[in-house]
Curated annotation (Swiss-Prot):
GO MF term set: 3'-5' DNA helicase activity; ATP binding; ATP hydrolysis activity; DNA binding
Protein's gene: srs2
Keywords: ATP-binding, DNA damage, DNA repair, DNA-binding, Helicase, Hydrolase, Isomerase, Nucleotide-binding, Nucleus
Residue ranges of domain UvrD-like helicase C-terminal in the record: 305-597
Protein name per Swiss-Prot or TrEMBL: ATP-dependent DNA helicase srs2
One GO term (biological process): mitotic recombination-dependent replication fork processing
Database matches in PANTHER family: ATP-DEPENDENT DNA HELICASE SRS2, UVRD / RECB / PCRA DNA HELICASE FAMILY MEMBER
A Pfam entry, by short name: UvrD-helicase
Length: 887
């Protein structure tokens, strides 16, 4: 634990003034990399120590659970665990949940309500839209005519809720929360209001509340029972520029009890307008709270000076922005690098090559996981993914394959929700998992009867079981038997683990579910190839349930299993589980929005074209500019920016019909040329020393600037296998495997001919002869142009377009990845988006082509030929070929 007030010694003058502010209302405007989390943490410690405020009398609102946990850990390091554990901290939603659990009865909430997460709300809305397809009334017809997707419909409802509009039982019109301004009338179309009413009724019936409801219900609670926050002395809010109208209204209600307010934010980083964030809240606070003191943090500890100069030149284009500076703590002689390319594909391959060049030039100084590629939207990653995969650059996508979104995990969570409160959405998901002869037709009929009779899905199931409700004229004994078996399993689990007198752990409950429904056997029947991977995920859930249980047991060792279960489900709904990555080095591909608050030593900002940034569908030019500013300020040492003139391939479908692109207006003008360089970065000891100082890395390997010029590129005199030769062999291998049916390889190869004699008659056996040849690594022998041309002809003649995509995946990894150390990561990236046939053949086989062959010097001397891949890889390639019907 740090000594009393020692945390103040690590602050600069600006930070110290902010931490010790005596003002009742304080705004701390913190630029990127200026230490806002440190200041917010120190401010909390200062209030607790110097102002003698009790920890339970402070509210700290953040925008992510990760940020809340980080602040709590830092407070714990300063003051100890006992004080930190008493803090009321978390996201607005999690804080609302804590108060609603404790005081929700004052606004009519039951004791066992649960949070509906994204999957639940999607399922509810899908069922509503499906039912409206059959309804015969004008409003239903109007909704059908709009052809809404579940997400579109939910977005409409969120818009209504974020403006404070409520559905009230028995009322056709929406009501506005007292104290809020009336929203535009166009928001409240008959169709939107009816969808909202039906959706909210479905939530109520299932005893659920969605995330928007948490904030609305918290407002209603504070208005009806303000004494529940009477003890709060100080409210601290992080990322204030991202607060919505509803969240700001909550802050005002919390402050009615004479609480002080400290906010930390940066108007230059307000990028969430599409989530109803209101940048105007900063100015509104100064108007609503008289005497608000505005303080600035302008010392940047993250980025090199040239990066900040470029970022400020971009954000300063907004003439309405209050002028404020940003001073760097790091000197660098390297300006941000800018390149303009003919096509998006050339841009992508250049980025992939440059990444390999950086890592190869700066050993032990810059690694793959130090590098990020940040794009305006996820739809722009296809070309980048493909280029990285072809050149053997390992990468990860941020925000995909979330743990709690995996099918097997969703199944088990649904079972837990059924046991917790008979949630209809979860019942519908698991009633036929594993299969029980209860198909979609039966489920739809049960849903219909539930809605017709005003019953919950669970109540209807029991009525059907007791034959009080008939789903068809004939008595379906098989269905009834299956239904009774399902209900019996649920009852058995309740009696065994949740009834009074039993104190089971959550892992006991989960293992009981797995045993009762024979889930492992179900996974085996479903897909033997994926069962082990899925079962590992299931066991991970069991382990996580125990970890979370321990936290609640520490708070209350007498906690019942049912309350423990409800808390566990709430944690799952509140926390956006991040995918657990291995320790392997990987480049990060992320959207600009997802990169907020993060940093990397090296950042690439590609696709900086008009209609991409600013986005063609955005009506807020200033927010788009702020988004680019946020992206630029993620970089610590090296920043690369790039644009292209035209698009090719599938990427073209998303852009202008003429495929012609203009550079982003944010990068135009003579002024911008002052802050960027277009020549290639030359790595040397001086540059490495500057980078090392910025990153705090004092020791690293020998710096060697790798540039690579065509076929003459080489490093330390080592010769490497010709990429075009590899590609020919792989194409030929695929062609041969397509014909290989009965004969063994040896029998097939009896009549070999020398493929290098290009004037010889080409036959099927020529192909085998060709791809078995190995280019001597230690010689200067090159493949002759006639031989290369002949192989192209074979590939074009015998490789049909239908199967080429699959072969291309093999070509991509084998032809472009000669470094054995990259093999593992490339295998993980197999199956990423392919190029067209002409692109691959031309790119990999044409002599002197700059997109692939240029940087052969980046490979290592332990190069292996394409056919010498690990057995597991060959097996996987074979499977892919069989799937594509090539074998």
């Amino acid at each position: 634990m740090e000594t009393k007030s020692s945390y103040l010694k690590f602050l600069n003058e600006e930070q110290r003034i902010s931490v010790q502010s005596p003002h009742k209302y304080t705004q701390i405007l913190a630029g990127p990399g200026s230490g806002k989390t440190r200041v917010l943490t120190a401010r909390v410690a200062y209030l607790l120590q110097k102002n003698h405020i009790a920890a339970e009398d402070l509210i700290i609102a953040t925008f992510t659970n990760k940020a809340a946990n980080e602040i709590k850990l830092r407070i714990e390091a300063i003051l100890g665990n006992s004080e930190a554990s008493k803090l009321i901290s978390g996201t607005f939603h999690s804080i609302a949940y804590k108060y609603l659990v404790k005081y929700g009865k004052h606004i009519g909430l039951s004791s066992n309500w649960l949070i509906a997460d994204r999957n639940d709300t999607q399922a509810i809305m899908k069922r509503l839209l499906d039912s409206l397809k059959k309804a015969k009334n004008p409003i239903a017809s109007g909704i059908r005519g709009q052809e809404l997707t579940p997400q579109n419909a939910l977005n409409r409802i969120t818009k209504l809720k974020s403006n404070g509009l409520l559905v009230k039982p028995g009322m056709d019109q929406l009501s506005l929360i007292n104290g809020l301004e009336e929203p535009p009338k166009e928001l409240q179309s008959h169709q939107s209001v009816e969808l909202y009413r039906l959706y909210q009724t479905s939530l109520w019936k299932n005893n659920l509340a969605d995330f928007d409801d948490l904030l609305l219900n918290f407002i209603l609670l504070l208005q009806k029972q303000p004494d529940c926050v009477r003890n709060i002395k100080h409210i601290l809010i992080d990322e204030f520029q991202d607060t919505s109208k509803i969240q700001y209204f909550l802050v005002k209600l919390l402050a009615l009890q004479n609480s002080d307010i400290t906010i930390v934010g940066d108007p230059d980083q307000s990028i969430y307008g599409f989530r109803s964030a209101e940048i105007r809240n900063l100015n509104q606070m100064s108007e609503d709270f008289e005497g608000t003191q505005v303080l600035h943090l302008e010392r940047n500890y993250r980025s090199a000076k040239p990066i900040l100069e470029l970022a400020l030149s971009i954000i300063s284009q907004d003439k309405s922005r209050p002028k404020k500076g940003l001073k760097s703590n790091h000197i660098s002689s390297l300006k941000p690098h800018y390149r303009l390319f003919e096509t998006n594909n050339k841009e992508s391959y250049w980025i992939a090559r440059e990444i390999k060049r950086i890592v190869g030039s700066c050993p032990e100084l810059i690694f793959y996981n130090d590098i990020a590629i940040l794009v305006r939207s996820s739809s722009l990653t296809r070309s980048l993914e493909h280029a990285l995969s072809e050149l053997g650059v390992p990468y990860r996508m941020v925000g995909v394959n979330k743990f709690f979104d995996r099918e097997e995990i969703r199944d088990l969570i649904a079972y837990l929700r059924v046991l917790a409160n008979k949630d209809s959405t979860s019942l519908i998901r698991v009633i036929n998992v594993p299969p029980r002869n209860i198909g979609k037709t039966k489920i739809d009929r049960i849903i219909f009867e539930s809605e017709r009779r005003g019953l919950t899905f669970w109540q209807t199931l029991n009525e059907v079981k007791n034959e009080n409700i008939l789903l068809s004229q004939r008595n379906d004994k098989s269905f009834l038997k299956s239904l009774k078996s399902f209900l019996c399993s649920i009852s058995k689990l309740e009696n065994r683990y949740l009834s009074n007198g039993h104190s089971a752990t959550l892992s006991d409950l989960l293992l009981g579910i797995l045993s009762e429904i024979k889930y492992y056997e179900y996974l085996v029947r479903k897909n033997k190839e994926t069962v082990e991977e899925k079962w590992e995920n299931v066991m991970e859930l069991v382990q996580q349930s125990d970890n979370i249980s321990c936290i609640f047991y520490e708070l209350d060792y007498k906690i019942s299993t049912i309350v423990l279960l409800q808390n566990f489900l709430t944690q799952i709904a509140l926390v956006n589980e991040e995918q657990k990555e291995g320790e392997s080095q990987k480049v990060t591909i992320s959207t600009l929005h997802a990169a907020k608050g993060l940093e990397w030593p090296v950042v690439f900002l590609p696709c900086l074209c008009e209609n991409i940034i600013p986005h063609s569908r955005s009506d807020d030019l200033d927010e788009e500019r702020r988004l680019l500013y946020v992206g630029a300020t993620r970089a610590q040492a090296l920043l690369y920016l790039s644009s292209f003139k035209s698009v090719t391939g599938m990427f073209a479908d998303m852009q202008n019909s003429d495929n012609v692109q203009d550079v982003s207006p944010f990068l135009k003008g003579e002024e911008m040329k002052r802050w960027v360089m277009e020549s290639e970065i030359v790595f040397n000891e001086k540059i490495a020393s500057e980078i090392g100082t910025i990153l705090g890395r004092k020791s690293y390997g020998k710096i060697t600037n790798l540039s690579g010029i065509g076929s003459n590129a080489n490093h330390n005199g080592t010769k490497f296998e010709n990429l075009g030769f590899q590609c020919c062999r792989v194409l030929a291998e695929a062609e041969l495997k397509k014909r290989e049916r009965v004969k063994s390889v040896n029998d097939y190869n009896k009549d070999e001919t020398n493929f290098r004699k290009h004037n010889a008659k080409r036959s099927k056996t020529d192909i085998r002869s060709w791809f078995e040849k190995k280019q001597p690594i230690d010689s200067d022998v090159e493949i002759s142009e006639p031989s290369r041309s002949a192989s192209i002809m074979v590939a074009n003649k015998d490789l049909n377009d239908r199967s080429f995509e699959t072969v291309n995946r093999i070509v991509s990894t084998r032809a472009s990845t000669t470094n054995a150390s990259f093999m593992s990561s490339v295998r993980q990236n197999l199956g990423r988006g392919p190029s067209t046939k002409d692109q691959v053949i031309n790119r990999t086989l044409r002599e002197g082509h700059q997109d692939v062959v240029q940087h052969t010097d980046l490979n290592q001397s332990n190069t292996k030929v394409a056919s010498a891949r690990p057995a597991g890889s060959r097996k996987r390639l074979g499977v892919r070929l069989r799937v594509s019907r090539m074998l």
